[in-house]
């Protein structure tokens, strides 16, 4: 997918664009995404595509347990542990890095990749509404990108509990009182 119409896309417009391409392909049963992109780090595109396609989704997948003609069963990571979920196909899944150990391509694979024909679709090729792509279709707008000011090192209070508690209260009260005004 490459078109100036896609420029400035947020995750919602990106999800719409990818969903339109999947519709064009047709007959897709399983749509696989990484958990998140390294640029925005939002983990929203996979679930957004599922929303646009009105398909089930399983996020944070660490292991595929079973798949048949109509369902997929996957184990997903949660903060508290793992959860096994079954969903009907077609389905969107987002995977975490623990799902697989990537392997390096063979020399033959590298050579063959140089000959590969890459199909490029523009917005018109996938039937995308220009008002839903790129900056036009993005409900969020980047106003400013900046590097936050460096934070000072923390302070360690040393002494007896009563003494350090009093010091801590003295330091926090102006912040607390100032925040409530």
Positions of predicted regions on the chain:
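N-terminal glycine-rich FAD/FM-binding segment characteristic of electron-transfer flavoproteins
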Residues: 1-181
